[in-house]
Amino acid sequence: SSSAASDVYKRQPYAFTARPWELNKTESIDVMDAVGSNIRVDARGAQVMRVLPRLNEDINEEWISDKTRYAIDGLRRQRLDRPFIRGRDGKLAPASWDDAFGAIAAKMKKAKPQAIAAITGDQCDAEAMFALKTLFDKIGSASIDCRQDGAKIGGARAGYLFNSTIAGIDEADALLIIGSNPRVEAAVLNARIRRNWLATRLPVGVVGPEMDLTYEAVQLGDDVATLTAILDGSSK
């Protein structure tokens, strides 16, 4: 009904907050997952108001995930916008940048270089990571990484590139998913897989933990032995 549709619209973060002609529109790339969906960021002043998809047939077509569309709420309501220092009572308290950097410097001066390490976050920009790397080069520590889960990622491009084009999923006659959950990790990619499955009953095999996908899939196993069996043709 029209009233139900109106109620849904009112619950959108952008609803009734700005007029389209008030917004500055910036073309960008989504960083909420590894798909690289093409997006447009609409902002009023310094505040992001909404995120919309941009057409790119080879990547996201005209789709974006719910996470991409609504993650801006985190910028408004849940983002840390000031430093915090843990006091003697064990609780975090707001602090000035001078105090925060002073506390960091004091801790680092007391420690040996080989005892200092840093891990960058998923959303860190290149400039911040370069500054961190420069700092650690100065203090003589090589212990800096971006793998928060301890994953072993090889330096060869084949280790991190998608082995087929995203658009190629539409033409695939079989699909093997290894150690990934597209529904959670790449919703737009998952939508392409489901569309092909609905149209052709695409055979999908999974090597990894069991998961709740939006299409039928055969659980082949969850270890290296399964992959070896697939490669040598002995897999059932």
Label for each model-derived stretch:
Residues R183-L198:
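Amphipathic helical hotspot of TIR/SEFIR-family domains
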Residues D42-Q114, N163, D170-A174, R194-K236:
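Cofactor-/ligand-binding subdomain signature composed of acidic, glycine-rich
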Residues Q114-I169, P209:
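Anionic-ligand anchoring segments at beta-strand to alpha-helix junctions in alpha/beta enzyme folds, i.e.
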Residues S2, I169-D170:
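A short, aliphatic-rich alpha-helical micro-motif
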Residues T17-A18, S37-N38, V48-M49, D58-I59, ...:
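Flexible loop/turn segments at secondary-structure boundaries
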Residues P20-E22, I29:
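N-terminal cationic and glycine-rich segments that engage phosphates or anionic surfaces
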Residues S1-A5, Y9:
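Single conserved hydrophobic/aromatic residue that forms the stacking wall/gate
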